[in-house]
């Protein structure tokens, strides 16, 4: 859509040069202008109050070319320029696009900057091979349009890596956007508004993006993929947007030829971006999201992102074999519900704070999920038949993850990894791990596996919490075996003690007895069980995997346990 707007701006201002007259009114018929990006045609152009003479305008038009367009546009002064129909045609290889603008009006142009630009609507048809996509747009209105700056961005190449950006458009409003793609999918927006659009020329010509676009059914080769990624990364870094909002967004996905699923749709009541600069997005929100496609229908009240940066993913594509993901500082989902084949799931809130990113993952992460509620009745029984058998009709889960990597010390702190249901119980893990290589976060399988095997454990802790599930289990087991709950609990406590001893020792050891007593007490009615392990010299991941019993490592461990 940015390219469409840029072409629109460039087309309008180039045509004005052929119709301007010195402080007078002129008309011109059958205008055709050729640029490196497209060919523009207009059957009729009316110019009112032009300061530039007709002869001078024709001279500027004759010079043409990307190198002189911006300078020529800066000489345009006119009270009003009207174009009933403007046609833009772009061709590159087997790609062709035709855009038709209707009833274009440009008001109060001074030195190439217009107070306002409006069009009653426009249509787009793009063809590549046998594939055709079509778009229809309603009324367009823009203010503070800097035509010379737009020409520099769309027709020129960057002269230096740090070339400053210029504001191209102060405000934009576009109504009734409808785009249809060949597979039956499409996009619709009731209203799009934005402000403070800026940019600079790309390192390579913008027309190169069109030439490099993949062909239908022909995945790009590695070299083309890297070139496209480099240009997209440059484009993201070369465009600024103060704010952009969409109302009534609808994305329709069509069925592929080998997919029997019917088309589906995702709708959003409101979408907003703010602070888009240097490839980063300060904030992004999407509200009132609904999907009723062939998969499970869902609703989300709100999705929000801040500090979003997509450039690392494209930069990774430039390097052979590299992998990376977009980065963000904060993400949240609020008020979600999923139909899930008759077993609905709802989510109160999920928040994620991420810092100190490597290629694929952050090395500082705090995530929270509250009130993930799922039914255990009807079709929901399959989610946990064991809990359903104990009489639970739903789960209401909360979860947490808190970790941090100290790159200087190569030390990973797992501060919290937990899951809890206030009516069932909970589990929490924490620990400190050493010799943690950055390769663990690389996303490259071999490097991640080797890094995992190199880790040593300094400290680890486990907490189990009984909020009722263990009591229900004891009662159910007692009933099934014709015992009282007290007798059954005693048997289970003895079993827990024996299992703890078998896990922690190959010979009598008072430290193992402490663990066994705590495990027995937990089963016998205590609400919490805490186990902590400390290894002053560190225990390697390989040692843990090869040890048949923790008792083999007892001399390296400090163990404590209690139940309350």
Residues covered by each model-derived region:
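Bacterial N-terminal signal peptides that target proteins for export
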Residues: 1-9
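N-terminal signal peptide c-region/cleavage motif recognized by signal peptidases
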Residues: 16-20
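Glycine-rich, small/hydroxylated-residue low-complexity segments
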Residues: 24-564
């Amino acid at each position: 859509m940015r390219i469409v707007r840029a072409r629109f701006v460039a087309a309008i201002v180039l045509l004005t040069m052929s119709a301007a007259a010195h402080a007078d009114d002129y008309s011109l018929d059958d205008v055709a202008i050729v640029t490196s990006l497209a060919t523009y045609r207009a059957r009729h152009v009316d110019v009112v109050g032009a300061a530039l003479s007709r002869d001078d305008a024709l001279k500027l038009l004759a010079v043409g070319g990307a190198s002189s367009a911006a300078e020529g546009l800066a000489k345009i002064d006119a009270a009003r320029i009207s174009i009933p129909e403007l046609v833009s045609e772009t061709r590159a290889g087997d790609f062709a696009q035709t855009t038709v603008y209707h009833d274009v009006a440009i008001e109060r142009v001074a030195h190439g900057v217009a107070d306002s630009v409006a069009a009653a609507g426009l249509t787009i048809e793009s063809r590549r091979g046998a594939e055709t996509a079509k778009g229809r747009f309603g009324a367009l209105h823009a203010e503070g349009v800097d035509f010379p700056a737009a020409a520099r961005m769309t027709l020129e190449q960057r002269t230096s890596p740090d070339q400053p950006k210029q504001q191209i458009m102060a405000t934009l409003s576009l109504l009734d956007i409808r785009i249809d793609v060949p597979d039956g999918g499409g996009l619709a927006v009731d209203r799009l508004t934005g402000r403070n659009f800026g940019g600079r020329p790309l390192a390579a010509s913008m027309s190169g993006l069109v030439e490099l676009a993949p062909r239908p059914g022909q995945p790009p080769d590695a070299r083309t993929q890297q070139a496209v990624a480099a240009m997209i990364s440059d484009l993201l870094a070369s465009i600024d947007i103060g704010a952009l909002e969409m109302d009534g967004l609808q994305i329709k996905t069509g069925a592929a030829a080998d997919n029997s699923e019917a088309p589906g749709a995702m709708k959003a009541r409101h979408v907003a971006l703010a602070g888009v600069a240097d490839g980063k997005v300060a904030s992004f929100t999407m509200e009132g999201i609904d999907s009723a496609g062939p998969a499970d229908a869902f609703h989300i009240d709100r999705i929000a992102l801040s500090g979003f940066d997509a450039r690392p993913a494209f930069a990774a594509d430039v390097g052979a074999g590299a992998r990376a993901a977009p980065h963000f500082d904060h993400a949240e989902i609020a008020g979600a519900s999923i139909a899930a084949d008759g077993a609905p799931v709802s989510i109160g809130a999920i928040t994620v704070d991420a810092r100190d990113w490597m290629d694929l993952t952050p090395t500082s992460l705090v995530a929270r999920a509250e009130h993930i509620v799922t039914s255990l009745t009807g079709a929901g029984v399959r989610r946990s038949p064991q809990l359903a058998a104990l009489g639970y009709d739903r789960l209401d889960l909360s979860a947490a993850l808190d970790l941090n990597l100290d790159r200087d010390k190569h030390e990973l702190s797992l501060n919290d990894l937990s899951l809890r249901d206030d009516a069932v119980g909970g589990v929490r893990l924490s620990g400190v791990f050493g010799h943690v290589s950055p390769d663990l976060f690389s996303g490259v399988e071999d490097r991640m596996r080797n890094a995992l095997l190199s880790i040593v454990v300094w400290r680890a802790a486990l907490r189990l919490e009984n909020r009722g599930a263990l009591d229900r289990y004891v009662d159910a087991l007692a009933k099934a075996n014709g015992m009282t709950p007290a007798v059954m609990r005693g048997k289970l406590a003895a079993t827990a003690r024996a299992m703890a001893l078998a896990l922690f020792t190959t010979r009598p050891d008072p430290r193992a007895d402490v663990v066994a007593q705590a495990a027995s007490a937990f089963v016998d009615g205590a609400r919490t069980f805490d186990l902590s392990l400390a290894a002053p010299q560190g225990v390697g991941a390989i040692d843990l995997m090869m040890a048949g019993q923790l008792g083999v490592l007892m001399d390296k461990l400090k163990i404590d346990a209690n139940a309350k």
